[in-house]
């Protein structure tokens, strides 16, 4: 790749996943749209690497190297083949596709769907795909939330390789949280997984991710009480009293509390 392509790719890959399109739009302006093919190619590689879902016939589908077929991608459970519009993140040129799935793969996918629906409240998707290496299956979960009015975005991606024959589960979990109100704070963490003697990979994933989520909650709480506390602006000392009893409704905090916000 050229130096220009390297820089473009790095900027897109470093962006919080739910804000990639905003970064792309800015890059189009900065580069004066002189090399749109390079930008689109980098955007597509970024979407695939981060497993960001594509809307295919009204439901999310994850595109990866495992379900690539020529210039298109297929969903083995929807039985469709499609191309990708990277900007709008939708599937185009959709056509029927007979993808072979095993009963065990379908069983894992059904269990995974139930787990994701119950535990990931954001924009979520999951899949189970053969890796092409013996009996190995890639188990992928991705979920994200974006609240621009509250100046934050969040992203979770967990990806595992499970071998039914060896009963091994390896993988990695990536979590990114971005706060950008009057500042710019990005929290990024990775957890690597390596487990053996696993007969039920979905139950194992459920337990692992619950433990990791608890650890993240504790880390955020500690961070909020230490490093974040140092960043907060200290309020000025006015040496005047606030009549909370009679005038609380005049203050924004009181109004929000009264309205249940």
UniProtKB/Swiss-Prot annotation:
<dbReference type="Pfam" id="PF01267">
    <property type="entry name" value="F-actin_cap_A"/>
</dbReference>
<comment type="similarity">
    <text>Belongs to the F-actin-capping protein alpha subunit family.</text>
</comment>
<dbReference type="InterPro" id="IPR002189">
    <property type="entry name" value="CapZ_alpha"/>
</dbReference>
<dbReference type="GO" id="GO:0008290">
    <property type="term" value="C:F-actin capping protein complex"/>
</dbReference>
<dbReference type="GO" id="GO:0110085">
    <property type="term" value="C:mitotic actomyosin contractile ring"/>
</dbReference>
<comment type="function">
    <text>F-actin-capping proteins bind in a Ca(2+)-independent manner to the fast growing ends of actin filaments (barbed end) thereby blocking the exchange of subunits at these ends. Unlike other capping proteins (such as gelsolin and severin), these proteins do not sever actin filaments.</text>
</comment>
<dbReference type="GO" id="GO:0051016">
    <property type="term" value="P:barbed-end actin filament capping"/>
</dbReference>
<keyword id="KW-0117">Actin capping</keyword>
<dbReference type="InterPro" id="IPR042276">
    <property type="entry name" value="CapZ_alpha/beta_2"/>
</dbReference>
<keyword id="KW-0009">Actin-binding</keyword>
<dbReference type="GO" id="GO:0030036">
    <property type="term" value="P:actin cytoskeleton organization"/>
</dbReference>
<protein>
    <recommendedName>
        <fullName>F-actin-capping protein subunit alpha</fullName>
    </recommendedName>
</protein>
<dbReference type="GO" id="GO:0030863">
    <property type="term" value="C:cortical cytoskeleton"/>
</dbReference>
<dbReference type="GO" id="GO:0051015">
    <property type="term" value="F:actin filament binding"/>
</dbReference>
<dbReference type="GO" id="GO:0005934">
    <property type="term" value="C:cellular bud tip"/>
</dbReference>
<dbReference type="GO" id="GO:0030479">
    <property type="term" value="C:actin cortical patch"/>
</dbReference>
<dbReference type="InterPro" id="IPR037282">
    <property type="entry name" value="CapZ_alpha/beta"/>
</dbReference>
<dbReference type="InterPro" id="IPR042489">
    <property type="entry name" value="CapZ_alpha_1"/>
</dbReference>
<dbReference type="InterPro" id="IPR017865">
    <property type="entry name" value="F-actin_cap_asu_CS"/>
</dbReference>
<comment type="subunit">
    <text>Heterodimer of an alpha and a beta subunit.</text>
</comment>
<dbReference type="GO" id="GO:0000131">
    <property type="term" value="C:incipient cellular bud site"/>
</dbReference>
């Amino acid at each position: 790749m050229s130096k220009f392509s390297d820089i473009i790719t790095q900027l897109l890959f470093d962006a919080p996943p739910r804000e990639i399109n905003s970064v792309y739009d800015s890059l189009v302006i900065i580069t004066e749209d002189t090399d749109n093919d390079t930008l689109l190619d980098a955007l597509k590689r970024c979407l695939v690497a981060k497993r960001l879902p594509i809307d295919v016939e009204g439901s999310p589908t994850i595109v990866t190297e495992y379900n690539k077929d020529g210039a298109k991608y297929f969903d083995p459970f929807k039985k469709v083949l499609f191309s990708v519009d990277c900007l709008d993140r939708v599937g185009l040129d959709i056509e029927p596709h007979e993808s072979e799935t095993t009963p065990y793969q379908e069983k894992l996918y059904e269990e995974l769907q139930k787990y994701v629906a119950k535990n990931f409240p954001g924009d979520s998707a999951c899949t189970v795909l053969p890796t092409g290496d013996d009996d190995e299956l890639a188990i992928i979960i991705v979920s994200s939330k974006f609240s621009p009015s509250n100046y934050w975005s969040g992203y979770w991606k967990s990806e595992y390789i499970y071998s039914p024959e060896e009963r091994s589960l390896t993988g990695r979990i990536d979590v990114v949280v971005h706060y950008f109100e009057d500042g710019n704070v990005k929290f990024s963490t990775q957890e690597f997984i390596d487990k053996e003697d696993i007969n039920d990979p979905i139950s194992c994933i459920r337990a692992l991710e619950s433990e990791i989520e608890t650890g993240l909650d504790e880390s955020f709480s500690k961070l909020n009480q230490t490093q974040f506390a140092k960043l907060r602006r200290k309020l000025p000392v006015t040496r005047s009293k606030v009549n909370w009893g009679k005038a609380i409704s005049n203050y924004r905090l009181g109004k929000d509390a009264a309205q249940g916000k």
